[in-house]
């Protein structure tokens, strides 16, 4: 039997079906821009072609309350329509990610780090590493879902283009094969259930079989109470366009009423 739950007013919801050039409720970091009603998360040259060694991030400006205590937890759903494309016949790199991080999170390295992590093995909460686009220390306090287009064996990547779930490190906890299609719009549906503690990912192209992935994690044990959600992407020596066409997000902060009632009964009996 599931515990009773009450929805809190402390929820976050937004939906972008297009992106204006001066989108005030978004924070742009690194090379990310908004142009022609889409997000270009990594840099393009004057001809609209991707460039090497680029990193960009876009965060929603309003912080999200992820948890209050062990009895007040947030569930969320986000849907991203995005396109990874290249005009070149060479390999592409490096990928795009949805991430959750502290509100003061800043961009990190390009290439295989996807603008998210200061180094491949970081498991602590901070680093003194610096990126070319910032002088502030980048934090590894990040949970991310990556769509990784470049295989980095040194980072523990499988030998195929994949979706991965990352927790405080670019080394994914779990991965699933992802059949990337050049220039086609992919849909990613990412959700977190605060009751089952499961982070789930489904991604698909129109008319194709979806790729699915999940990982059980208690987000309140690895992330602070207040966070921001964002999108991040990078290129290395090889390159790609990382284009976001739309993005929606909704969250619900739930209170575990049954647990609180039991705690109150215990306290009452103690007083008597």
From Swiss-Prot:
Preserves hematopoietic progenitors in suspension culture by preventing their proliferation and differentiation even in the presence of a cytokine known for its strong induction of proliferation and differentiation. FRIL's ability to preserve quiescent primitive cells in a reversible manner may significantly expand the time and range of ex vivo manipulations of human stem cells for clinical applications. Keywords: Glycoprotein, Lectin, Signal, Vacuole. Alpha-D-mannopyranose binds at residues 94, 112, 152, 237-238. InterPro entries: ConA-like_dom_sf, L-lectin, Lectin_LegA_CS, Lectin_legB_Mn/Ca_BS, Legume_lectin_dom, Leguminous_Lectin. The keyword Signal applies. It is found in: Protein storage vacuole lumen. Residues 1-8 form the signal peptide. GO terms for molecular function: carbohydrate binding. GO terms for cellular component: protein storage vacuole lumen. Its main location: other. Pfam families: Lectin_legB. Glycosylated at Asn-125 by either a paucimannose type N-glycan (alpha-4) or a single N-acetylglucosamine (alpha-3). Glycosylated at Asn-131 by a paucimannose type N-glycan (alpha-2, alpha-3 and alpha-4). In alpha-2, Asn-125 is deamidated to an Asp, possibly due to the action of intrinsic peptide N-glycosidase (PGNase). It comes from the Eukaryota. Glycans are attached at residues 125, 131. Four different alpha subunits (alpha-1, alpha-2, alpha-3 and alpha-4) are observed and their different polypeptide masses might be due to differential C-terminal processing of the corresponding polypeptide or to differential N-glycosylation of subunits. Alpha-1 lacks the 8 amino acids N-terminal sequence present in the other alpha subunits. Alpha-2 and Alpha-4 differ in their glycosylation pattern. Alpha-3 et Alpha-4 are N-glycosylated at their N-terminus. The Asn N-terminus of alpha-2 is deamidated into Asp. Mannose-binding lectin. Accommodates most effectively a non-reducing terminal alpha-d-mannosyl unit. Strongly precipitates murine IgM but not IgG. Dimer (alpha/beta)2. Tetramer (alpha/beta)4. Belongs to the leguminous lectin family. This is Flt3 receptor-interacting lectin. It comes from Lablab purpureus. The lineage of its organism: Eukaryota, Viridiplantae, Streptophyta, Embryophyta, Tracheophyta.
């Amino acid at each position: 039997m599931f515990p009773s739950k009450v929805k809190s007013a402390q929820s976050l919801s937004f939906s972008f079906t297009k992106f204006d050039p001066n989108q005030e409720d978004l924070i742009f970091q690194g090379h990310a821009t908004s142009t022609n009603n889409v997000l270009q998360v990594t840099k393009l040259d004057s001809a609209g072609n991707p460039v090497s060694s680029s990193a960009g991030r876009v965060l929603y400006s309003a912080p999200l309350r992820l948890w209050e205590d062990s009895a007040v937890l947030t569930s969320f759903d986000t849907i991203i329509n995005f396109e990874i494309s290249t005009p070149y016949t060479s390999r592409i790199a490096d990928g795009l990610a949805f991430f959750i991080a502290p509100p003061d999170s800043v961009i990190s390295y390009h290439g295989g780090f996807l603008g998210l992590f200061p180094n491949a093995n970081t498991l602590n909460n901070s680093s003194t590493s610096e990126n070319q686009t910032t002088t502030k220390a980048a934090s590894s306090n990040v949970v991310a879902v990556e769509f990784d287009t470049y295989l980095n064996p040194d980072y523990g990547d499988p030998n195929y283009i994949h979706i991965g779930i990352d927790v405080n490190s670019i080394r994914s906890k779990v991965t699933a094969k992802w059949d990337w299609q050049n220039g086609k719009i992919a849909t990613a549906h990412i959700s977190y259930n605060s009751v089952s503690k499961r982070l789930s990912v489904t991604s698909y192209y129109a008319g194709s079989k979806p790729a699915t992935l999940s990982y059980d994690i208690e987000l309140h044990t690895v992330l602070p109470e207040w966070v921001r959600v964002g999108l991040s992407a990078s290129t290395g020596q090889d390159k790609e366009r990382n284009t976001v066409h739309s993005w929606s997000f909704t969250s619900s902060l739930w209170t575990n009423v049954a647990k609180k009632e039991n705690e109150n009964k215990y306290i009452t009996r103690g007083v008597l």
